[in-house]
Amino acid sequence: MLKPGDPGGSAFLKVDPAYLQHWQQLFPHGGGGGGPLKASGAALALGAPQPLQPPPPPPPPPPERAEPPPDGLRPRPASLSSTPAPSSTSASSASSCAAAAAAAALAGLSALPVAQMPVFAPLAAAAVAAEPLPPKDLCLGASAGPGPAKCGGGGGSVGDGRGVPRFRCSAEELDYYLYGQQRMEIIPLNQHTSDPNNRCDMCADNRNGECPMHGPLHSLRRLVGTSSAAAAAPPPELPEWLRDLPREVCLCTSTVPGLAYGICAAQRIQQGTWIGPFQGVLLSPEKVQTGVVRNTQHLWEIYDQDGTLQHFIDGGEPSKSSWMRYIRCARHCGEQNLTVVQYRSNIFYRACIDIPRGTELLVWYNDSYTSFFGIPLQCIAQDENLNVPSTVMEAMCRQDALQPFNKSSKLSPSGQQRSVVFPQTPCSRNFSLLDKSGPMEAGFNQINVKNQRVLASPTSTSQLHSEFSDWHLWKCGQCFKTFTQRILLQMHVCTQNPDRPYQCGHCSQSFSQPSELRNHVVTHSSDRPFKCGYCGRAFAGATTLNNHIRTHTGEKPFKCERCERSFTQATQLSRHQRMPNECKPITESPESIEVD
């Protein structure tokens, strides 16, 4: 028997020649202390396993479904097949051979890149995402002791001497899980009770009778379709949230790596289509602050008319939510096709583009998201007389303003640095709640390039990166404390000035009410240069400012000649004269006659 302490010993076991050939095909390079695998008749020499040379990495495989499947759709566990030991081998010999084969398999698995590892490799790559990335490759592995895993030597190293394998992941493979897409497959549910024989596979539509264009396909389907026993079997019981799935959408496997299921369009969805409302459990901000909700993946915020956080809608529990919980969030603006809209106290999804059939629905905020929450982009250029070019390469998109900056720019899909323009700050929050008049329309002020300052150029992006921490974007403007999530910043009570939490993003002034901040932000807007000296409001024209100042002074220069009423504006006088019963002339009283 081979002892663990013998570094170069060998053990000769009687093994069937077919079994030897099987392992030689699996490990063609061999791995014994004295060289490759040796066979003498029916004898096999197994030594200490050596690491194998890693083969060239193929394209990355589809990631493992990290999310558990919904109720009623749990797949069967995958069966593991192994080569059985020959009957002529004794129990002890079989166990020794299995141990040696497992050691060789472990050495070979540790030398393989992530692309050739089993399906659990993407999960291991996601588990060490917080570890600082090496310049080119990322070493993945599990450490026996506490602390993060560290990279070993060169490629193909087994581990740290304790039998723990380590793996290597390139930046391209990590980029796949951040920006790539996996294959999407439609999951048939048969939740509709229409006759399957009348469904056209080419038109993807249910018809009464044969399809006029693809009729012969139905006859063939009935002949070679399901058997009578399978057709007589009742359909599986579907979860409650899947029974309400409309015909316009269907369940599918998500294209976002690491997610199991998603929702795709079963037919073309036109731009402007509303989906909702989003169903879930109402949670107070205090309950979320206590940390009761662990999974915030299906959590939406509801704000009142003043912009104050009112409550949350949690769709994490499938029994109390709907199928909309499986509409995933878009990772970048290129794959977004839905925008989230708050109408009164409900959450709806609105199609921002025409969604073709077979496309997964992905939702995110619209461009007015930063304006609503008062998140101005921090200006780097301090020179007021800065010469601004007449054209701008590309405006900063929503994700650039909200997502943290990565330490390395190699993972960017485009690989190019972009110029950023400081947008105009609106005088009020455009993403506000609606009254009974109609749905919400998220407006956004257009950018005036001549009056704006360029935040960054392709040569000064290092300054922009230094303004923000690597993984902490949400920063308090008074105590400069940073947070990883925006909700944590909203629940933060600043110790520096708790009575005036609303701070201007352009200057150091802070206010106690959001309305005061909105009135103050107008003073920084460049398109309203005429400012009132009484209340501080700014206007775009001098005439509008003069009409406004008369409301403070009480001056009424516009006088009606018939009834002698005075008005502050000429439009008020004109409207007064057009009203038939409003302007009444003053009747002169007759002169009195004195009688002697």
Curated annotation (Swiss-Prot):
Tissues of expression: Expressed in a variety of smooth muscle-containing tissues and displays especially robust expression in the cardiac outflow tract and descending aorta during embryogenesis. Also enriched in vascular precursors during development.
EC annotation from Swiss-Prot or TrEMBL: 2.1.1.361
GO biological process terms, semicolon-separated: methylation; negative regulation of DNA-templated transcription; negative regulation of smooth muscle cell differentiation; negative regulation of transcription by RNA polymerase II; neurogenesis
Domain SET intervals: 247-366
Chief subcellular location: nucleus
Result when mutating R550Q: Loss of function in histone modification. Loss of nuclear localization
Reactions this protein catalyses: L-lysyl(20)-[histone H4] + S-adenosyl-L-methionine = N(6)-methyl-L-lysyl(20)-[histone H4] + S-adenosyl-L-homocysteine + H(+)
CDD domains assigned to the protein according to its UniProt record, in alphabetical order: PR-SET_PRDM6
InterPro entries linked to this entry: PRDM6_PR-SET, SET_dom, SET_dom_sf, Zinc_finger, Znf_C2H2_sf, Znf_C2H2_type
Subcellular location: Nucleus
UniProt-recorded name of the protein: Putative histone-lysine N-methyltransferase PRDM6
Gene this chain is encoded by: Prdm6
